């Protein structure tokens, strides 16, 4: 009897404890961090399902002990603990269809409210459910680092996202790469995903080690761009690393020289061209090993600059040198030098090849001069379409000799020049004599050559409406140099017998007076005559003849093929014998009422 009573008491106590919800089940959802700025409002919300009976809900702040803030009972309502300001802490209950939300509103918070807040539900019969929030109240901070990277074009640039990171970085940090130029910002990467659709970086950007940015190849358009990496440690703490790119390009230099006239001025033009320049560079001229200061008489410099569509600069400097008879030396050496900035505060020094020329090559001939030395034109234009105009990189001087002597050019020409000078005649055509006579006289030279020029005077042809007799000291003497060019062995576009006669576009007539002074009077442009030798055929005629024969053979072939097709169509069809006759067999019926066999064969 006593043992049975003991069991009943124990069972009753257990039932009472179940009824009062004494069996507590603790569900800790883990530490949920909530970040908030000082002075802002924060809502802390937790909810539970409606499958159990709600007994009580409460919010508490967890310190050394649990400090209760507010309690809610479905029957008795809300109850705030003493010392809690209702204006700054308000609780609300929202009943949904299948759940109940329990929210704590914190208004105008400060750093003193930072800490852990516990939300608990007392349910019957499941017990107590608890959720803990970690409220962090601190100002927004951004640790920013700026730097500049200098690099050449067509190189690979690697920009790290962060360096010397500490242990406070969470494994769940997020990052993003942005690029900015001229106030326009674009997102390149976010969370390992390439989100940029810009054509300027198509196929050039990628992620490297430790979330670094890899840019290859570097282009001129990348100059001035700022690449920023945002490493978000928390919603209130961001590390930002900004890298500004400065791009440099090593220039290419090219120098040319041309002789624009052959008169007494002896003008020469030197052109220094600087390509693929970035940023801008400066061009300096050196004459006989010394820097040109710009205050020398007879030397003029003009500078031009142009920005191409690719972003590179193109600089052009032109030095014009007028012949000075009082020069101490007969030769002059000229070259140009470019100074351009490079990465790491260094300067690139790019120089052209020195060009040396003679100052005496621009002397004009007098009325009767056995041997006269002149300068060739800087840019020669030829009538033949396949002979491109050339420009001498060094001064090319020639000696006027007798038409029977072949004098080679003592100064080398450029590799682009395919024409060699054979005869140069200063002619003064007379009335009744045309340019054809002068060309025949130029082409009458023999095949042999002597090592030294002849001292025989050149031929002078009188101009129209002028006399060939002796002239007065004050009378004008018109002289026009005609250059006879023959193709060299290296020129495949002209035959070995083609002769091209070219006269200068505009040349001054020399007026000689009795006292030795010289007056200049400009003449007019003469024509260009191309003479074909009697014993040969020019290449255009040969090409036209060959083309005519090819077209003729093709036409004959087409005509033959058409005739063959016509013959095939007109042929009679092949003979086809008729089919053999069909033989019928007679079957006589036993009744004897049918037709005889011979009658059926007739039918």
Swiss-Prot record:
Spell out the GO cellular component terms annotated for this protein, sorted alphabetically and separated by semicolons. Answer: cytoplasm; membrane
- Its predominant location is membrane
The membrane-spanning stretches of this chain are: 538-558
Q: Where is the Ig-like C2-type domain?
A: 251-356
Composition bias type Polar residues, residue spans: 412-436
Carbohydrate attachment sites?
Answer: 43, 108, 146, 154, 164, 197, 259, 307, 324, 331, 349, 371, 416, 425, 437, 515
* Protein's cellular compartments: Membrane
Q: What is the top-level taxon of the source organism?
A: Eukaryota
Q: Which residues form the Ig-like V-type domain?
A: 24-132, 139-245
Q: Which InterPro entries match?
A: CD80_C2-set (IPR013162), CD96 (IPR042381), Ig-like_dom (IPR007110), Ig-like_dom_sf (IPR036179), Ig-like_fold (IPR013783), Ig_sub (IPR003599)
Q: How does it sit in the membrane?
A: Single-pass type I membrane protein
User: What does this chain do?
Assistant: May be involved in adhesive interactions of activated T and NK cells during the late phase of the immune response. Promotes NK cell-target adhesion by interacting with PVR present on target cells. May function at a time after T and NK cells have penetrated the endothelium using integrins and selectins, when they are actively engaging diseased cells and moving within areas of inflammation.
How it assembles, according to the record, is:
Homodimer; disulfide-linked. Interacts with PVR.
Protein's recorded name: T-cell surface protein tactile
């Amino acid at each position: 009897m006593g043992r049975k009573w003991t069991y009943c008491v124990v069972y009753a106590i257990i039932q009472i404890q179940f009824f009062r919800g004494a069996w507590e089940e603790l569900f800790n959802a883990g530490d949920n961090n909530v970040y908030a700025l000082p002075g802002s409002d924060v809502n802390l919300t937790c909810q539970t399902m409606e499958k159990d009976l709600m007994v009580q809900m409460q919010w508490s702040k967890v310190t050394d002990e649990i400090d209760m803030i507010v309690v809610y009972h479905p029957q008795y309502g809300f109850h705030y603990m003493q010392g809690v300001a209702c204006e700054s802490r308000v609780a609300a209950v929202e009943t949904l269809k299948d759940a109940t939300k329990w929210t704590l509103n914190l208004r105008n918070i400060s750093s003193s409210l930072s800490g852990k807040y516990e939300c608990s539900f007392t349910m019957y019969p499941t017990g107590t459910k608890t959720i803990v929030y970690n409220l962090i109240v601190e100002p927004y901070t951004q640790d920013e680092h700026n730097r500049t990277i200098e690099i050449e074009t067509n190189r690979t640039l690697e920009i790290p996202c962060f360096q010397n990171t500490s242990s406070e970085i969470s494994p769940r940090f997020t990052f993003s790469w942005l690029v900015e130029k001229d106030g326009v910002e674009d997102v390149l990467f976010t969370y390992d995903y390439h989100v940029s659709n810009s054509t300027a970086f198509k196929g050039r950007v990628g992620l490297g080690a430790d979330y670094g940015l890899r840019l290859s190849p570097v282009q001129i358009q990348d100059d001035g761009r700022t690449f920023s990496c945002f490493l978000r440690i928390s919603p209130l703490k961001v590390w930002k690393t900004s890298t500004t790119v400065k791009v440099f390009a090593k220039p290419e230099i090219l120098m040319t020289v041309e002789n624009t006239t052959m008169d007494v001025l002896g003008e020469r033009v030197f052109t220094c061209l600087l390509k693929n320049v970035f940023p801008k560079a400066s061009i300096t001229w050196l004459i006989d090993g010394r820097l040109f200061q710009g205050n020398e008489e007879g030397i003029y410099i003009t500078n031009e600059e142009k920005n191409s569509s690719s972003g590179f600069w193109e600089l052009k400097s032109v030095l014009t040198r007028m012949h000075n008879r009082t020069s101490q030396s007969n030769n002059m050496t000229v070259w140009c030098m470019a100074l351009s900035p490079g990465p790491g505060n260094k300067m690139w020094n790019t120089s052209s090849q020195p060009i040396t020329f003679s100052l005496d090559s621009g002397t004009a001939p007098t009325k009767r001069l056995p041997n006269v030395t002149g300068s060739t034109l800087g840019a020669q234009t030829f009538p033949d379409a396949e002979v491109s105009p050339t420009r001498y990189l060094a001064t090319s001087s020639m000696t006027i000799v007798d038409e029977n002597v072949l004098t080679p050019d003592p100064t080398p020409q450029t590799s682009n020049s395919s024409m060699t000078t054979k005869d140069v005649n200063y002619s003064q055509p007379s009335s009744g004599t045309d340019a054809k006579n002068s060309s025949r006289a130029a082409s009458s030279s023999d095949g042999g050559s002597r090592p030294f020029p002849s001292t025989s005077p050149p031929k002078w042809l009188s101009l129209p409406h002028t006399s060939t007799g002796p002239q007065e000291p004050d009378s004008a003497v018109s002289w026009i140099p005609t250059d006879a060019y023959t193709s060299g062995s290296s020129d495949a576009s002209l035959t070995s017998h083609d002769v091209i006669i070219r006269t200068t576009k505009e040349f001054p007539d020399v007026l000689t007076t009795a006292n030795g002074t010289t007056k200049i009077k400009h003449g007019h442009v003469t024509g260009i005559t191309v003479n074909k030798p009697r014993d040969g055929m020019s290449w255009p005629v040969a090409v036209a003849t060959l083309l005519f024969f090819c077209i003729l053979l093709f036409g004959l072939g087409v005509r033959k093929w058409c005739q063959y097709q016509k013959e095939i169509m007109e042929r009679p069809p092949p003979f086809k014998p008729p089919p053999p006759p069909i033989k019928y067999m007679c079957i006589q019926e036993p009744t004897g009422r049918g037709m005889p066999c011979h009658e059926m064969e007739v039918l």
